[in-house]
UniProtKB/Swiss-Prot annotation:
Pfam families: DUF468. This is UPF0320 protein YOL166W-A. Belongs to the UPF0320 family. It comes from the Eukaryota.
Length: 51
């Protein structure tokens, strides 16, 4: 399950659609292992750091 979540994170474009993709990834995360949620949190932290 985490594979589907990660595949939705990496190709994520830095556009106005980021907010929509974020909700989509969080929705998948709840159905996957903790590893998926951890990867999502890491990506969000990196996004805000770069932003």
């Amino acid at each position: 399950m985490h594979g589907a979540c990660l595949s939705g994170l990496y190709p994520l474009p830095f556009t106005h659609k980021f907010h929509d993709y974020l909700h989509f990834n969080i929705y998948i995360s709840f159905g996957g292992p903790k590893y998926c949620i951890t990867a999502l949190n890491t990506y969000v932290i990196l996004f805000y750091t770069v932003y």
